[in-house]
A protein has these predicted regions:
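Metabolite-binding pocket within alpha/beta catalytic cores that recognizes anionic/polar moieties
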Residues: 2-123
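Conserved small/polar residues in nucleotide/adenosyl-binding loops
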Residues: 127-133
């Protein structure tokens, strides 16, 4: 399985890139895409820029151009929940738009939330140091 990893900032993807072996750079859409491996896993890594539109565009690109079967969006984010600190790893089981008005409910294909893929979530849990918490 090939994994796409996207992050909004170069600083967010730097540690992932350092862990990769057999790295090759591909220039597409004005960005550098890096293919390689982390252990036995095939990785496609790109800095997508800030915002949900950029995230969607580059998630699409790693799927379409590099045939990624799963996409992981990494990086910093504002925290709403109590007990979440700086440098904590947060894995979502469900995600929702915070900036959509209720008027959107009547327009297809509106969805209030999106469920995380259970297999991908389980995979991510394997690589968090505090997964038991």
């Amino acid at each position: 399985m090939r994994y796409g990893i996207i992050g909004a900032l170069d600083e967010e993807i730097a540690l992932v890139k350092e862990q990769m072996t057999e790295v090759k750079e591909h220039k597409l859409y004005g960005r550098s895409f890096y293919t390689g491996r982390i252990g036995e896993k095939e990785i496609v890594l790109v800095c997508c820029g800030v915002g949900k539109v950029n995230a969607a565009l580059f998630a699409n690109a790693v799927i379409r151009e590099f045939h990624a079967e799963a996409v992981i969006n990494i990086g910093i984010a504002g925290a709403i929940g109590a007990g979440i600190g700086v440098m904590d790893v947060v894995l979502s089981t469900e995600a929702a738009f915070h900036d959509q008005d209720e008027v959107m409910v009547k327009y297809y294909p509106f969805r209030r939330s999106f469920q995380a893929d259970p297999a991908l979530l389980a995979f991510c849990l394997l690589y968090t140091s505090d997964a038991a918490d």
